[in-house]
Amino acid sequence: MTCTTFLVGKKASLDGTTLIARNEDGGDKPNPQRFVVINPENQPKHYRSITTACEFDLPENPLSYTSTPDADSSYGIWAAAGINSENVAMTATETSTTNSRILGLDPYVETGLGEEDFTTITLPYIQSAREGVERMGQLLEEYGTYESNGMAFSDKDEIWWLETLGGHQWAAIRIPDDAYVIAPNRLNIDWYDFESSDTIYSTGLKEFIDKNKLNPDFDGYNLRHIFGSSTIKDTRYNNPRAWYVQNYFSPETTGNDDPFNQDLPFICHANRKISIEEIKFVMSSHYENTAYDPYSTTSSAAEQKLIRPIGLNRNLELHVLQIRDNIDKKLAGIHWLAFGPNSFNSLVPFYARVSDTPTCYRDTKADFDPTKMYWLTTMTAVLGDSNFQGYVDKRDNFDLNTMAKLRALQNETDKVSDQSLEAVNEKLAQIALTAQTELLGKMVISGSNHMKLRFDFND
């Protein structure tokens, strides 16, 4: 998937929690999403990929976990992300890049694993973020992959980022507690220390690099230089997303005036602690206050179409997976979720330790149905795109008021762990659904006064 990932260590976040977020993006046509819980009895014992027919038995005693699969399962599950009942989170995947030197040595495995499979075969079987890396690495070395991907794992203490490097090679790195990462669709890890306790990698990776003379740098190992790309497409499709977010959070240290820069850093440090609301902003961003904003009223059409925004029509869902410490384990995992294009939606803080999810998020169908949140938010975004400047104030008021109501209910729930979290999630869903419906209604009423098919006549 052509996604964008954002990671925040526990000392870099406003409330001291680990946060891993990703926009799951698709093609230009809608690809409806569901929000479900997979309980142990519903987890397959034998897995078979629809894309490649790769198959094998899965371990016994899986954990329950949240996920956001496609409504149309004919192409596979595509579980995307979730939090398991041990409060370990995973998001997979960020489609990335490679180069011909690597594929000539370690080609893709057409019968291997890919984004369709990773979450389903990993998340129910791990007790920590580090275990997630180890299981994923073992699967990659055994079965291989048919694409280049990045994925994140988190628990209450750690965040790990893993990238595939060809068909079987891979490397992972622990994100420092005081750091953040913005990862577009390129190979993202840069400087890498093979001797560090904060790195894990495939068997013989350093020897593979040295033996095949793959390192272009005189000193050190930069995995992006070795395994990644540096193309014209990167300058317009990938690098600008990292550029905008780094200028937003750390202009003093990583900010610059070049959105096409091929060597933007991987590990970054913000000039303030990062909130959920700010994550929502950057994951919805379209280069606001720059000439590259497609909704700009002052820049040229060429500038507005030059680079790929983070928030766009292809957003299927945004998840922010939060693992909290110093709170009852039952309440610790929060699966923040927003469906559809991020320009006109809101994140909802669903509790992850549940056995079911709200129907307006769970029962999404492939056909249009505005009573389901995915279709309602998508419809709102389509209308909003027709006159963004005319609707943006209504959007901002909706976002402020909706988040305040959701946070108020969350704050009350956090005080009492012995309650039905399924019922709380239903209340959260209804707050969001009502607010989204009201926003759409206000936009329709306002927009009707500005239709081209009109004629002013006093009678």
From Swiss-Prot:
UniProt xrefs under InterPro entries: C69_dipept_A-like, Peptidase_C69
E.C. number: 3.4.13.19
GO BP, one annotated term: proteolysis
Entry keywords, A to Z: Dipeptidase, Hydrolase, Protease
Keyword tRNA-binding: no
Source organism (scientific name): Lactococcus lactis subsp. lactis (strain IL1403) (Streptococcus lactis)
Keyword Signal on entry: no
Family: Belongs to the peptidase C69 family.
Full protein name: Probable dipeptidase A
Residues annotated as catalytic: 3
